[in-house]
């Protein structure tokens, strides 16, 4: 019996299994949204959930709690893993930071340029220039893990690091170009929460409840500030101490405790909530419109080209080095996966066009097709063409 339990636990925490679960939830969402349960699916996502304390009230649809709340925990876990790398891993050398930064920069500039070139002259369509700049880290990482053990773990760290810079870029883009109103008061409260965690860290305090309270205050204030709330998860991770005063692992313990919830609850729920695109509303004839072509070229061509080009230049001119144990073929394979914009691109699309159906949902279809092509081609390339030699 114990052997069976051990095998089940190993399966659940296996990252490849997590990737399969994400794909299953994605297909399930598409089936439900386009089947007889579509009305219940939408009601579930639009269900208002919240609380109030005095005059303060936070009452949002369940979809927001998933996208801004639960997924913040995912980015918190990413932040924890990155902190380990910065302090005790490859990123202890500042030179190793250059590569993911340059890769993310190329992955933002080139897709945006392609979209603008295709849609130049159409002011309204150009509002969506940032759609192909996004990467759905959860899906990209899941597919990378499904490629097997012949892919070096350093490439996983590279993708995660790239994702952080990519997400910061996305947050800045949203804050500057897609935010109508920023709250200074909320920013001040966020600053106080960050300062409190800094003090806790300096004093070496390792009471989880203290960090939890500060992180909740930070998350709410960032949410209210008008900036995407997932940034709170990354910021919180950077203030978690590596170990207790007695030398016991503190950060590692928190990270390990999150693995089950990430694999079995958070990421599958995120996929199920965001993948439900109503295919019946899509006008196939509009798939060759400027917005659709711009999105497809930006994600499937621009992302991999931009990320790889800027990475190659950084390596060629010796500003950076290849991730340990990897080669250019494997690096290019990871670059392909960055074209999986999926949920993040759908999110920015909703901000850019204010959830309008002016394009008959052809923009949504373009995101799905480009993400699907990037995922399939990236998996095939990494699995069968990219080798260590």
From Swiss-Prot:
Chief location category: membrane
Catalytic activity: Na(+)(in) + 2 H(+)(out) = Na(+)(out) + 2 H(+)(in)
Residue intervals passing through the bilayer: 12-32, 62-82, 97-117, 128-148, 157-177, 184-204, 220-240, 260-280, 282-302, 305-325, 331-351, 365-385
A Pfam family assignment: Na_H_antiport_1
Single Gene Ontology MF annotation: sodium:proton antiporter activity
The organism's place on the tree of life at top rank: Bacteria
Subcellular location: Cell inner membrane
Gene Ontology terms: cellular component: plasma membrane
InterPro entries named among the record's database cross-references: Na/H_antiporter_dom_sf, NhaA
Membrane topology: Multi-pass membrane protein
GO BP annotations, alphabetical order: regulation of pH
Key words of the record: Antiport, Cell inner membrane, Cell membrane, Ion transport, Membrane, Sodium, Sodium transport, Transmembrane, Transmembrane helix, Transport
Family annotation (HAMAP family): NhaA (MF_01844)
NCBIfam families: NhaA (TIGR00773), PRK09560.1 (NF007111), PRK09561.1 (NF007112)
PANTHER family documented for this protein: NA(+)_H(+) ANTIPORTER NHAA, SODIUM ION/PROTON ANTIPORTER NHAA-RELATED
Functional note: Na(+)/H(+) antiporter that extrudes sodium in exchange for external protons.
UniProt similarity note: Belongs to the NhaA Na(+)/H(+) (TC 2.A.33) antiporter family.
Name by which UniProt lists this protein: Na(+)/H(+) antiporter NhaA 1
Gene behind this protein: nhaA1
